Amino acid sequence: MAHDRVGNRLKELRSKAGMTQARLAELVGVSRISILAIENGRFLPTIETALLIAQTLDVPVERIFWLKEENS
């Protein structure tokens, strides 16, 4: 499922940045539960939140939220 791929990429990039879910949530302006839900594939963020997450992690938004399979 696309949500799972997004969640896995977000978790990986957040971890590489040395950031906790709580810290990312604080910097983006959402709850830690929201970050947890995105990482667990329960939902996708709004466009505004997606852009803020990407900006906070210093990566292009499509690196996290590209829904197409990488090897397709």
Positions of PLM-derived features:
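Short, charged recognition helix plus adjacent turn
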Residues: 55, 65-72
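DNA major-groove recognition helix of helix-turn-helix/homeodomain DNA-binding modules
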Residues: 48-63
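Short amphipathic helical patch at the helix-1/turn junction of helix-turn-helix
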Residues: 4, 15-16, 44
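Short basic helix-loop element that most often maps to the first helix and adjoining turn
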Residues: 8-27
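Recognition helix of helix-turn-helix/homeodomain-like DNA-binding domains
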Residues: 29-43
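Residues in the helix-turn-helix
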Residues: 23, 34, 63
